[in-house]
């Protein structure tokens, strides 16, 4: 609701009327390279608005967020979720477990978040490297954060091309 304007359709979304206010669209439209009126219609949440260009995501990065992950990723308008291994580890009392290999409790947390995103039909964001991007794609990672070489390898693996 906070990311949507009051005029955005909300019937059937499980959300209330948008609460985003007026006034900031002039400068934002300049940044986006369009008129304020165009901005008002494009600066909406995809997939609720198929023409919207804002993608909302969640970072599930501690045990409290993990306890609610299934409900959180089911909120209308959420497009992806990721886990935060560094903070997740700290919340489990593991101050230096931000990199692989992860202990069992961390692997279980990541698996639960990945499963929740699959069930909700949204993307899972995870770090990818050149040496693991294909495995990450196979396990269900839809948004990979990593170096350009990993992105290129992932595009070749999925036979996807960039539009430019």
Tell where the protein language model's regions lie, with residue ranges.
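C-terminal helical cap(s) of enzyme catalytic domains, especially alpha/beta-barrels
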Residues: 1-8, 98, 149-164
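Conserved anion-binding
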Residues: 1-75
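Active-site-proximal loop/turn and secondary-structure-junction residues that shape catalytic pockets
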Residues: 60-64, 87-89, 130-132, 150
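Glycine/Thr-rich beta-alpha phosphate-binding loop at enzyme active sites
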Residues: 78, 83-105
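Glycine-rich phosphate-binding active-site loops on the catalytic face of alpha/beta enzymes
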Residues: 81-91, 141-161
């Amino acid at each position: 609701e906070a990311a949507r304007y009051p005029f955005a359709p909300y019937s059937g979304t499980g959300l209330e009327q948008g609460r985003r206010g007026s006034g900031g669209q002039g400068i934002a439209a300049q940044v986006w390279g369009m008129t304020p009126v165009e901005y008002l219609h494009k600066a909406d949440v995809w997939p609720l608005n198929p023409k919207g260009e804002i993608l909302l995501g969640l970072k599930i990065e501690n045990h409290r967020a993990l306890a609610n992950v299934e409900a959180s990723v089911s909120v209308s308008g959420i497009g992806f979720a990721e886990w935060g291994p560094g903070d997740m580890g700290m919340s489990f009392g593991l101050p230096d477990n931000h990199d692989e290999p992860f202990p069992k409790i961390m692997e279980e947390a990541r698996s639960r978040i990945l499963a929740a995103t699959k069930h909700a039909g949204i993307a899972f964001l995870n770090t990818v490297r050149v040496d693991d991007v294909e495995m990450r794609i196979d396990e269900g990672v839809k948004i990979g954060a990593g170096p350009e070489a990993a992105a290129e390898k992932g595009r070749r693996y999925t036979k996807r091309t960039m539009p430019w």
